[in-house]
Amino acid sequence: MVEKKFLEAVKKYSLISEGDRILVAFSGGIDSTVLTYLLIKFRDHLKISDIYLAHLNHSLRKESDEDQRFCEDFAKKYGLEIFTKKVDIKSLAEKEKKSIEQKAREERYSFFRKVMEERSINRLATGHHLSDLVETMIMWFIQGNRKGIKGFRPKERDIIRPLYLINKDQIENYAREKGIEYRIDITNFETDFLRNRIRHNIIPHIKGINPSLEGSLLTLSYFLSLDDQYLEEESEKISQKFLNGKIELEELLVYDKALVYRAIQNWIYRKTGVYPSYRQIMDIMEIIEKKEGTKSIRLSPEYNLIRRYSTLYIEKVKEKTEPYQYRIKPGEKIFVKEANLYIKSYIETDYTLDKLKDERKKVCFQIESMEDAEFVVRNRRKGDRFIPFGRKKEKKLKDVMIDLKIPSDMRENIPLVVYGNKILWIAGYKRSAYFPVTEKGKKLICFELEEV
């Protein structure tokens, strides 16, 4: 039965081709040992060129070194080349603030990839089987993970799972019949970890309701994978449209929500290497439906997703801007590091009123005794008020910035040019009503932005 299902999976899913060089992820446990035994037995039949073993010693159990010796002896017995590496997973996980399971997986696959690259190996075979598939689907269902609930496929790029159609009981019976020795990991019989609780407590109860649980979930996995593949391909086409670094919501929201959230996931992953959680995706979907103001969501310690009105951006997390202040006199030029720009001040005598209309990059004021005047460039302070040009009444600076649609996450950085207690200019946005230019021929004090 096991051998028949092994060969069926190899053929049905095109797992092995003539001349393949296969690296087995070899723990010494029953699954990887039976897998290796089957590969050796059918090596000639499947025309496999080479079989190699790779064992990562996680240093998690007192028996870890004995596990490694077993793997080395097994390789020697069957004339296979084995690659081993020893790492302290617990210390690495603590240092990087990751779970032991996550860090162990990262180290294993990094090790496997290195071996494959160095030895020109084109297939990585793992011992995942049908019972693993069932456990995985139930585990992700319990955790509400859409991407994981479909389980794993028998073949994903160069990773193959030849035991895909074989369950755990069948593997154990086969090992017993063939006298195959293997290492036993006692943690597999503990119930502290979610997967083991599913294996030993939950699945037996479900099988009491549906004895064909494995077959049912195998079929479900197949159809969920088909749906997922199609939606991923379509959403990838959408995310490709936003390679310039931002998303215009008018262009995105013409698509169905099933594609929108996937496109956003792909876009975020491509930009940051971070795969957003479902809680984050739900928050993102909520804020993109509202186009007023600015909203942000922390994706990771390094990145924020920001919606500024109808546009989505991804930006690195900025340190909180502290109050800053610079002094500037006519004829001087200063660098405002907090805004990453220069502001220069100078006296203007040759001008026309028409040329003074661009208040975003340059503003001029008609101030008496300007040669001795000293101005301050600073960011906003609590209680700041401002009189926009063309108005007579003061407004709260915060309200003016909202009217100008200045994103909330940028307001602390924007330079203000101040004279005495009067804010003359919201640099790059709006001049005040103070000291308007009313007569030609008068000397003017001007301020101009220069970007780095």
Curated annotation (Swiss-Prot):
Molecular functions (GO terms): ATP binding; tRNA(Ile)-lysidine synthase activity
Function description: Ligates lysine onto the cytidine present at position 34 of the AUA codon-specific tRNA(Ile) that contains the anticodon CAU, in an ATP-dependent manner. Cytidine is converted to lysidine, thus changing the amino acid specificity of the tRNA from methionine to isoleucine.
Name recorded for this polypeptide: tRNA(Ile)-lysidine synthase
EC number: 6.3.4.19
InterPro entries linked to this entry: Lysidine-tRNA-synth_C (IPR012796), Rossmann-like_a/b/a_fold (IPR014729), TilS/TtcA_N (IPR011063), tRNA_Ile_lys_synt (IPR012094), tRNA_Ile_lys_synt_N (IPR012795)
Family to which the UniProt record says this protein belongs: Belongs to the tRNA(Ile)-lysidine synthase family.
Organism (species): Persephonella marina (strain DSM 14350 / EX-H1)
Gene Ontology terms: biological process: tRNA modification
HAMAP family per the UniProt record, alphabetical: tRNA_Ile_lys_synt
Keywords for this protein: ATP-binding, Cytoplasm, Ligase, Nucleotide-binding, tRNA processing
Positions of ATP binding: 27-32
Domain notes: The N-terminal region contains the highly conserved SGGXDS motif, predicted to be a P-loop motif involved in ATP binding.
Stretches that traverse the bilayer: none
Top-rank taxon: Bacteria
